[in-house]
Amino acid sequence: MKNFFSYDPKLLVYGFLIVFFASYGQTFFISLFNTEIRFYYGLTDGEFGFVYAISTLFSSFILISFAKLIDHIDLRTYSLIVTVGLLLACIGMALLINNIFYLFIIIFMLRFFGQGAMTHAGETTMARYFGSNRGKALSVATLGGMAGVMFLPYISLNYFINIEMKQLWFYASISIIVFIPFIFLALSGQKARHNKFDQGLINDPLNLKLRTRDIIKDKKFYIYLPLSIAAPFISTGLMFHQIYIFSHKGWSLEMLGNGYILLGFFSIVGLLIGGPLIDKFHTKKTAITVLGPLLLSVIVLLLFDSVFFLFIYMSLYGLNMGI
């Protein structure tokens, strides 16, 4: 483990930070403002959900083509593009205007640059440059996302509860501006790092570059596809409507913020379990395990209203996110 952290510590910092700041485009953060956004635009839960779903689907389709850039341009350039994109999206939220098309564009940018491109950059970088330790490296990057899950809702709901939504998004913009210089500090020596990676491609079949058409023709792709989309599909729905769900069950927003601390903790537990499992048994033997905690969390949410089960739900949900 010591050799792992000393191999390329700056790149690990990059993976952690870029996935952490991608949190601003994640459903768990955006949904904290669900009520304010709906009130501002006069939308029902279903109408805002429709706008959010279309924006997310559109961003995912565009990402399929856009994400290829990371294979063809310098990682520093790619990272700067996607980070500035998220910065503009946060500024757009801070300057929100009452136009439904404007809302669609801003949600699209948050989802595309945050949830999509920045997370993709962090995870791809970890998997690419750490070879047989890619599982542990991916855990470090994912830990950045878990830190966002743990602290951003807690801070927002406990310390900024009386601050207007637009002002909070302005603060988010400032934090991204502060983050941008760290991209270049963490990615110093990137040219030499990538040259070393290219040299190892011939001897490492795990790093084989595949075209999209090759993946689509592979039967294993269609076996793993349901497993890959089930967890995020269900999780996004739960997160997006979390304010409504908690209100319906009589759970306060402060409880939600505190619950995220527990969610983040068990996400880390899941990471500590999942990373070594991937390195030892590989993905094909561990993929199915991610659905177990999620299934249990949904059952708990469906059957129980006690505050005690709120924390059971958040714990199981966090374990699912980590694994």
Sequence positions of predicted segments:
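Extracytoplasmic gate region of multi-pass secondary transporters
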Residues: Q26, I30-I37, D218-G274
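Hydrophobic core of transmembrane alpha-helices in multi-pass small-molecule transporters
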Residues: F20, F101-A117, I229, F309-I323
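Flexible cytoplasmic inter-helical loops of multi-pass small-molecule transporters
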Residues: S188-L210
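C-terminal ends and interior cores of transmembrane alpha-helices
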Residues: V84-N98, P293-D305
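Cytoplasmic helix-loop-helix junction between adjacent transmembrane helices
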Residues: I107-L143
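C-terminal transmembrane helical hairpin of 12-TM major facilitator-type secondary transporters
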Residues: L263-F266, G270-I323
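Helix-to-loop junctions at the C-terminal end of transmembrane segments
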Residues: I62-L75, G270-H282
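Helix-loop-helix hairpin linking two adjacent transmembrane segments in secondary transporters
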Residues: S132, V140-A192
